[in-house]
Amino acid sequence: MLKAKILFVGPCESGKTVLANFLTESSDITEYSPTQGVRILEFENPHVTSNNKGTGCEFELWDCGGDAKFESCWPALMKDAHGVVIVFNADIPSHRKEMEMWYSCFVQQPSLQDTQCMLIAHHKPGSGDDKGSLSLSPPLNKLKLVHSNLEDDPEEIRMEFIKYLKSIINSMSESRDREEMSIMT
């Protein structure tokens, strides 16, 4: 059974924990409390299997605290990560400015492929859902960008996340198959 490690990273108060709980069908948190370090959520998704072989997959979603005081822990968090989801609050201009730093630290430095990264522009309840005005600079504009609004259209983000998980598992499965073939030849 394949097991994938996915990091949820991004600025403080971007909605990482709320999204992580929703996408893993974990408990709801009604009051804001900053994540201290990391919170690991383990889950399975019946819609995601390994290369259509029917083999189940397990996931670890690492909900990483966005405070810079945890920066010294980031290398340990990144170890053996298969994917990174950068979550930001699209309504806060400073979050947009921080995006390149998160991308550099969690995607470029550990040499992950852009396909292993997804951006989520999270819109908090009551903030509106302005999908049209978000322009990102290179290299962020090459990444998959999904808008989330759990109040208006929660299933859209769930479906996009399942697609993302499938792409991560397919990549892992192909890599494992290549490794097995190289051993046999």
From Swiss-Prot:
Phosphoserine modified-residue sites: 137
Location of the protein in the cell: Cell projection, Cilium
GO MF annotation terms: GTP binding; GTPase activity
An example Gene Ontology CC term for this record: centrosome
ATP-binding listed as a keyword: no
InterPro entries the record matches: P-loop_NTPase
Keyword field: Cell projection, Cilium, GTP-binding, Nucleotide-binding, Phosphoprotein
GO biological process per UniProt: cilium assembly; intracellular protein transport; intraciliary anterograde transport
Binding site for GTP: 10-17, 63-67, 123-126
Protein family (similarity comment): Belongs to the small GTPase superfamily. Rab family.
Described function: Small GTPase-like component of the intraflagellar transport (IFT) complex B.
UniProt-recorded name of the protein: Intraflagellar transport protein 22 homolog
Species in which this protein is naturally found: Homo sapiens
